[in-house]
Design a protein with these regions (language model features):
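Extracytoplasmic metal-acquisition and chelation regions
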Residues: 3-187, 191, 195
Length: 196
């Protein structure tokens, strides 16, 4: 079960913690995990996931996490993932980007990392477009991987997670339909000749 067995100072049961890299992941994880977990993002809202360095308190707090959901190909993870896991080796790590078709980013001066003779450095990218959550197709994969990870962590609540995943899936599908509808209306409007 998701229970930690710990109680807070107020005497209530503390929820186990899942740490994610980014706020978009936090949205997916909270949408599916519901009230079973507390979800913490390593890169705070408004901070750059390419250049953010965690503060010491975050490294200490990471030790309280049951799992870490990584997104892959973000500068923060490339720079910090090994150190984070060395700091908290008991944490189960799940790659929520598994199965996503990545887009190569040939931006000469992108925000990513580029490997030159075996080393990475920021600010120069011929690598992967890291903003994988911006596609509804990818959002469905991220949500599916998050659902599977939660079921692995807490099999007893699989039906609860399934119901919440199904609800999120429908919201993403509705968003996709709305985007497609708006784009098709834009295309019709653009392609119609102006009449005088």
């Amino acid at each position: 079960a998701a229970c930690t067995g710990r109680t807070s100072q107020s005497g209530t049961e503390e929820k186990p913690v899942i740490t994610v890299t980014l706020e978009p992941q936090r949205y997916f994880t909270e949408a599916i995990a519901g009230d079973k977990y507390t979800v913490v993002s390593m890169v705070p809202k408004g901070s750059s996931p390419e250049t953010y360095d965690p503060v010491p308190q975050q490294l200490v707090s990471l030790g309280d996490s049951k799992a870490y959901f990584r997104i892959g190909y973000i500068g923060f993870e490339q720079a910090w993932m090994d150190r984070l896991m060395n700091n908290a080796p008991h944490i189960q790590v799940f790659d929520t980007s598994k199965g996503i078709d990545l887009i190569l980013n040939d931006n000469e001066h992108g925000n990513g990392y580029h490997d030159h003779e075996g080393h990475n450095h920021p600010g120069h990218s011929h690598a992967v477009e890291p903003h994988i959550w911006n596609s509804t197709a990818n959002a469905l994969i991220l949500a599916g991987n998050t659902y599977k990870a939660l079921c692995t962590l807490d099999k007893a609540n699989e039906l609860y997670y399934r119901n919440r995943y199904d609800s999120l899936y429908q919201r993403i599908q509705q968003t996709d339909s709305l985007i497609r509808q708006q784009l098709s209306l834009s295309l019709i409007h653009i392609s119609e000749p102006t009449r005088r």
